[in-house]
């Protein structure tokens, strides 16, 4: 799904999505089968997963070593995309039946948990933009409370995660990209403006930093729900989750905006290699 972000990064995400699909097609029983690592020789298919992970982390290291500076507002929210892809990696092998299965004990289904993540992310954007506009230079109990209804009802939890897993993932992307577009140029002064979170006095910067931890908090909840449902991940599914997280670490170097063209090029090239390797690992099972 196209999102309000750099088109090259959108392309790279599509390549990673395809790579995850290819890797999930490898059964655990086939992980020990041979795979030819180009220009090196025969290893097993399992190592193909780790080769992708290693290459993504090497690309991350290359960008980090370049020392490209980033504005504080971007650095604060960049970890959010790591959390995003950790969640995507966890959700990747699930069926719609998994999303809607009742874990009992009045706990949320996985779909309800993800709907909360998506709706909350939209609300973070809408309400933080309001706090920014107030330009209040204090963060204590004198702060007013934000009015209700600033967020769009189209993003309510009741509908935020409707549809297929692809649609749910696309809506997560849109919620995040929409929030970053709304809050893409916060100054250091604006990050220090007063705001509220869960009615407590905080700062705009705190609310921005909360994006990543909120997604992670509920990714843990999804993990717990899968345990309650008795759904044990396969080895390949565990490895796919690691690959998705590695991509998230790399994407965090260029999201919400790349520091320079070289960093984006390194990222897109790594996504292309990941997609090619994943396709090769999958095809090795048909040889």
Stretches found by the model and what they are:
Residues 8, 12, 156-175:
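A short, structured beta-strand-centered segment in the mid-to-C-terminal lobe
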Residues 167-196, 221:
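Glycine/small-residue-rich hydrophobic helix-like segments
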């Amino acid at each position: 799904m196209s999102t309000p972000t750099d088109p090259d990064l959108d392309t790279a995400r599509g390549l990673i999505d395809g790579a995850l699909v290819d890797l999930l097609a490898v059964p655990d029983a086939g992980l020990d089968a041979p795979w030819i690592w180009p220009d090196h020789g025969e290893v097993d298919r399992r190592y193909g997963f780790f080769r992708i992970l290693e290459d993504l982390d090497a690309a991350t290291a290359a960008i980090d070593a370049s020392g490209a500076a980033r504005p504080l507002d971007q650095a604060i929210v960049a970890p959010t995309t790591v959390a995003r892809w950790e969640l995507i990696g966890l959700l990747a092998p699930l069926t719609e039946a998994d999303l809607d299965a009742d874990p009992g004990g009045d706990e949320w289904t996985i779909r309800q948990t993800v709907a909360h993540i998506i709706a909350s992310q939209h609300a973070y954007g809408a309400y933080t933009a309001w706090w920014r506009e107030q330009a209040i230079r204090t963060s204590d109990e004198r702060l007013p409370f934000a009015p209700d209804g600033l967020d769009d009802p189209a993003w309510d939890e009741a509908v935020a995660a409707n549809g297929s897993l692809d649609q749910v993932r696309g809506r997560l992307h849109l919620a995040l990209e929409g929030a970053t577009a709304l809050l893409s140029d916060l100054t250091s002064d604006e990050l220090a403006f007063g705001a509220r979170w869960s009615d407590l006095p905080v700062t705009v910067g705190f609310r921005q930093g909360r994006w990543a931890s909120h997604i992670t908090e509920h990714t843990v909840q999804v993990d717990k729900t899968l345990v309650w449902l008795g759904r044990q991940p396969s080895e390949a599914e565990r490895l796919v989750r690691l690959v998705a997280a590695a991509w998230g670490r790399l994407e965090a170097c260029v999201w919400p905006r790349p520091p320079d063209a070289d960093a984006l090029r390194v990222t897109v090239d790594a996504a292309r290699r990941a997609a090619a390797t994943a396709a090769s690992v999958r095809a090795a099972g048909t040889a």
